[in-house]
Amino acid sequence: MRDIMGMMGKVKEMQSKMEKVQQEIAALEIEGRAGGGLVTVILNGKGEMRGLKIDPSLFKEDEVEILEDLIVAAHKDAKEKGEAQAQEKMADLTAGLPLPPGMKLPF
């Protein structure tokens, strides 16, 4: 019976830590860049876009496709960085847990 109570206590502690880490992740601000910094996308930890910076030199009618590609690339860069930071924070939390390889938390 003590084992079950101890396990329940650990589960509650883990839930509390998980909530804290999720809040930390949500508060992250991640910048993705493309075109050598000509385009910058800013995402929060949830992957929501919070900002976009475009160098004025890209505002040329004949370079619209280039600008579109750079925006997509900068967004992808920011998203990948955010996912990596989130995985790093979660790895610290789940260290020692027998989770299957490649399993992403939170679910």
Swiss-Prot record:
Residues 98-107 have a biased composition (Pro residues). The keyword rRNA-binding does not apply. GO terms for molecular function: DNA binding. Keywords: Cytoplasm, DNA-binding. Disulfide bonds: none annotated. Residues 81-107 are annotated as: Disordered. It is found in: Cytoplasm, Nucleoid. InterPro entries: YbaB-like_sf, YbaB/EbfC. One of its GO terms (cellular component) is cytosol. Binds to DNA and alters its conformation. May be involved in regulation of gene expression, nucleoid organization and DNA protection. Belongs to the YbaB/EbfC family. PANTHER family: NUCLEOID-ASSOCIATED PROTEIN YBAB (PTHR33449:SF1). Homodimer. This is Nucleoid-associated protein Atu0095.
